[in-house]
């Protein structure tokens, strides 16, 4: 295909745009008009088929999260169907944990057929440890050529993002690529079942432009701290919203991948959003949001969300992604739909007297015994249910066997699990693959049974995302350690991971992992709430470090530039190091520019003796400015940035009056290197609210001649226009 050939030039252009805002049409007016008339490039997507956490352990020890069946369809198939329906023509699927299983599934699916409208490209690596690693690899491989969608492989959605994409592209066109991301949200009341507690956010947004001004995870907080500057700007109005569900769908510009490369401390999307909002002035980048009211979007981040989203699919809230649609074109997943949302696959057998009350999906080849009662449940293909069984809000995967007299409430049974006679599973129980429990036993609420011993987790830190991590050791432990009949029954096979009767710390871990956070607001103490609120304040805008931190930062920048000069380090790497120092010491952009300007302007003084000589100073400084000009251009973007840099330059020459006559040459160098613009230099020079020393500095003859030359050049340019 031609796409890989086009990719490198596209990336080069996007990097240039980050600085200048110039389009690919070049400087000619005809080229620009031609570029405007061209259709938008094919839409691409980056699908991250890994969560980089253990939220679904021990379930995901047997299969990756994106292959977990929801309403008998793998999660990743929902995500790919959403991307294809919304117009994506090329999707890069990044896999780490159990990548071989994901690759095998995709290669057998319709997504890898020659007729697929969405070309799926699978990229695997055991080195990915976060979303940040994935996006840095996207940038290194130059995979994206224009705006792209960023999603996880467990997103379920029917949102048509066409309007959001058009708004995103229009903003970037009008504001010269300032907006780098548009986040998709869905209106949803705080009590809605699909609201995931750990994903709850408070968002402050410009009501006119939908620009995100503040983004904060609530995490059970009762109070929130907002920077006062949010409400003091020139915006027409600011909305503070708590009625939004984060769909985990983002429209990204190519700059997003580049920003992850430039800021290696960004590991998650939240890191990225927080970094850009707290330090928005770094590159002048902005984040916007798009809110949908009627469409559906959610991420299956824990079993609470799994249950809620599965129920929504069965109740047809995600239309057209319904069970009978069979959008995967699989012969084993076809089914019929009847009243009360009863879905039956082929070759299903239902015994005499059994009742399917409502919202029930029966997979192909499933056999139901007599006098059973089933409601709000999903039963996978090839399952066998005995007589007199009660299933309420239960999810059975492929090949599960439930013997007579069993009662299962709000629980999950994975592939080939088996429940013996007269077993009761209390709510929020989980049996992972091939576990056997019973007979004649009641599992307490919150029980999690797995064939993997829980103590095998303690020694897995070094290889937590490796497919073979600890596999041999687990097998040895299984051989040495028998099953406890008190936990799993006389004929049971499995180990108890968590149970409601265990200590509070383990219960909290269960809630945070499999079923998600459960916040009891009344029990939260006032001091804890205030402490949590205060902990957010360092991320607020306007916070400045202590003076000694600035001094340390200045010394670190000086050391970085010295090494850069001695070792010939590229400017891109110098920017990376300065950015990491900026975050380490919580330095604002204004302070970065002040320190950078001060350090560079003082750099030649290390090689000079007193008294200072202007000619010698310029001879030493100008080559440094030329070499490090990309570093300056990385931070000096907007008019306000130019004025801050000019103020720092003025402060230096006020401090070193003996070098005052050099200022004109220095400003000329900044101008010729396209670091400072002529209009901002003229604006700075004409400032009237300066000190007496500042006014005296402006009377320097060389400086006045330079300013006069700039004015004449500006007038000539205006006449030519």
Curated annotation (Swiss-Prot):
Disulfide bonds: none annotated. CDD domains: eIF-2B_epsilon_N, LbH_eIF2B_epsilon, W2_eIF2B_epsilon. The modification Phosphothreonine is found at residue 322. It comes from the Eukaryota. The modification Phosphoserine is found at residues 27, 130, 450, 466, 469, 532, 540, 544, 717. GO terms for cellular component: cytoplasm; cytosol; eukaryotic translation initiation factor 2B complex; nucleus. SMART domains: eIF5C (SM00515). Residues 22-33 have a biased composition (Gly residues). Residues 543-720 form the W2 domain. There is a cross-link at residues 61, 103, 141, 217 (Glycyl lysine isopeptide (Lys-Gly) (interchain with G-Cter in ubiquitin)). GO terms for biological process: astrocyte development; astrocyte differentiation; cytoplasmic translational initiation; hippocampus development; myelination; oligodendrocyte development; ovarian follicle development; positive regulation of apoptotic process. Activated by the chemical integrated stress response (ISR) inhibitor ISRIB which stimulates guanine nucleotide exchange factor activity for both phosphorylated and unphosphorylated eIF2. The modification Omega-N-methylarginine is found at residue 19. It is found in: Cytoplasm, Cytosol. Residues 1-40, 444-483, 523-547 are annotated as: Disordered. One of its GO terms (molecular function) is guanyl-nucleotide exchange factor activity. Phosphorylated at Ser-544 by DYRK2; this is required for subsequent phosphorylation by GSK3B. Phosphorylated on serine and threonine residues by GSK3B; phosphorylation inhibits its function. Polyubiquitinated, probably by NEDD4. The modification N-acetylalanine is found at residue 2. PROSITE patterns: W2 (PS51363). Residues 1-13 have a biased composition (Low complexity). Residues 456-471, 523-537 have a biased composition (Acidic residues). PANTHER family: TRANSLATION INITIATION FACTOR EIF-2B SUBUNIT EPSILON. It is linked to Leukoencephalopathy with vanishing white matter 5: An autosomal recessive brain disease characterized by neurological features including progressive cerebellar ataxia, spasticity, and cognitive deficits. Brain imaging shows abnormal white matter that vanishes over time and is replaced by cerebrospinal fluid. Disease severity ranges from fatal infantile forms to adult forms without neurological deterioration. The disease is progressive with, in most individuals, additional episodes of rapid deterioration following febrile infections or minor head trauma. Component of the translation initiation factor 2B (eIF2B) complex which is a heterodecamer of two sets of five different subunits: alpha, beta, gamma, delta and epsilon. Subunits alpha, beta and delta comprise a regulatory subcomplex and subunits epsilon and gamma comprise a catalytic subcomplex. Within the complex, the hexameric regulatory complex resides at the center, with the two heterodimeric catalytic subcomplexes bound on opposite sides. Acts as a component of the translation initiation factor 2B (eIF2B) complex, which catalyzes the exchange of GDP for GTP on eukaryotic initiation factor 2 (eIF2) gamma subunit. Its guanine nucleotide exchange factor activity is repressed when bound to eIF2 complex phosphorylated on the alpha subunit, thereby limiting the amount of methionyl-initiator methionine tRNA available to the ribosome and consequently global translation is repressed. This is Translation initiation factor eIF2B subunit epsilon.
């Amino acid at each position: 295909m031609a796409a890989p050939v086009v990719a490198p030039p596209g990336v080069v252009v996007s990097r240039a745009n980050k600085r200048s805002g110039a389009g690919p049409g070049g400087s000619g007016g005809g080229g620009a008009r031609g570029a405007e008339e061209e259709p938008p490039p094919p839409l691409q997507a980056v699908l991250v088929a890994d969560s980089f956490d253990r939220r679904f352990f021990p379930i995901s020890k047997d299969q990756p999260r994106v292959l977990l069946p929801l309403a008998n369809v793998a999660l990743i198939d929902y995500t790919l169907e959403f991307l294809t329906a919304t117009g994506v023509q090329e999707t890069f699927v990044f896999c780490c944990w159990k990548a071989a299983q994901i690759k095998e599934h995709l290669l057998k699916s319709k997504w890898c057929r020659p007729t697929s409208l969405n070309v799926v490209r699978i990229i695997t690596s055991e080195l990915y440890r976060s979303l940040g690693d994935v996006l840095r690899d996207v940038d290194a491989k130059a995979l994206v050529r224009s705006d792209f969608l960023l999603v996880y492989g467990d997103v379920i959605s029917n949102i048509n993002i066409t309007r959001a994409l058009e708004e995103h592209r229009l903003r970037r066109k009008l504001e010269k690529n300032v907006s780098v991301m548009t986040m998709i949200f869905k209106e949803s009341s705080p009590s809605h079942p699909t609201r995931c507690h750990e994903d709850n956010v408070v968002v402050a947004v410009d009501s006119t432009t939908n620009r995100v001004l503040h983004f904060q995870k609530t995490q059970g907080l009762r109070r929130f701290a907002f920077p006062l500057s949010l409400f003091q700007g020139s915006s027409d109005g600011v909305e503070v919203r708590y009625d939004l569900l984060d769909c985990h769908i983002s429209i990204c510009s190519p700059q997003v991948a580049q920003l992850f490369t430039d800021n290696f401390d960004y590991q998650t999307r939240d890191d990225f959003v927080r970094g850009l909002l707290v330090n928005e002035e770094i590159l002048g980048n902005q984040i916007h949001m798009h809110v949908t009211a009627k469409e559906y979007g959610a991420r299956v981040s824990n079993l609470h969300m799994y249950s809620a989203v599965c129920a929504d699919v069965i109740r047809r809230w995600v239309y057209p992604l319904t069970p009978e649609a069979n959008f995967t074109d699989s012969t084993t997943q076809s089914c019929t739909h009847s009243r009360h949302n009863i879905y039956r696959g082929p070759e299903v057998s239902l015994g005499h007297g059994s009742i399917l009350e409502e919202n029930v999906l029966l997979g192909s080849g499933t056999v139901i015994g007599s006098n059973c009662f089933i409601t709000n449940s999903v039963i996978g293909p090839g399952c066998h249910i005995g007589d007199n069984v009660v299933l309420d809000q239960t999810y059975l995967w492929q090949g599960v066997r439930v013997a007579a007299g069993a009662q299962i409430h709000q629980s999950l049974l994975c592939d080939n699990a088996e429940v013996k006679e007269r077993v009761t599973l209390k709510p929020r129980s989980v049996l992972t693959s091939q576990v056997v429990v019973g007979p004649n036993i009641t599992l307490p609420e919150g029980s999690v049974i797995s064939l993997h011993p829980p103590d095998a987790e303690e020694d897995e830190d070094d290889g937590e995302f490796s497919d073979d991590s600890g596999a041999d050791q687990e097998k040895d432990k299984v051989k040495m350690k028998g099953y406890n009949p008190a936990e799993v029954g006389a004929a049971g096979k499995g180990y108890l991971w968590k149970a409601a009767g265990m200590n509070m710390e383990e219960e909290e871990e269960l809630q945070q992992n499999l079923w998600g956070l459960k916040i009891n607001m009344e029990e939260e103490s006032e001091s804890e709430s205030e402490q949590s609120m205060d902990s957010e304040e360092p991320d607020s805008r306007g916070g400045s470090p202590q003076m000694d931190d600035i001094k340390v930062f200045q010394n670190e920048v000086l050391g970085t530039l010295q090494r850069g000069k001695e070792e010939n380090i590229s400017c891109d790497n110098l920017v990376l190091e300065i950015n990491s120092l900026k975050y380490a010491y919580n330095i604002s952009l204004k302070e970065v520019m002040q320190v950078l300007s001060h350090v560079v302007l003082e750099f030649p003084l290390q090689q000079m003796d007193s008294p200072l000589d202007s000619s010698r100073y310029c001879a030493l400084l100008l080559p440094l400015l030329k070499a490090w000009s990309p570093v300056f251009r990385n931070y000096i973007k907007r008019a306000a940035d130019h004025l801050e840099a000019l103020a720092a330059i003025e402060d230096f020459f006020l401090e070193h009056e003996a070098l005052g006559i050099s200022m004109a040459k220095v400003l000329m160098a900044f101008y010729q290197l396209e670091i400072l613009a002529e209009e901002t230099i003229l604006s700075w020079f004409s400032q009237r609210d300066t000190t007496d020393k500042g006014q005296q500095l402006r009377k320097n003859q060389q400086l006045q001649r330079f300013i006069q030359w700039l004015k004449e050049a500006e007038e000539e340019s205006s006449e030519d226009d």
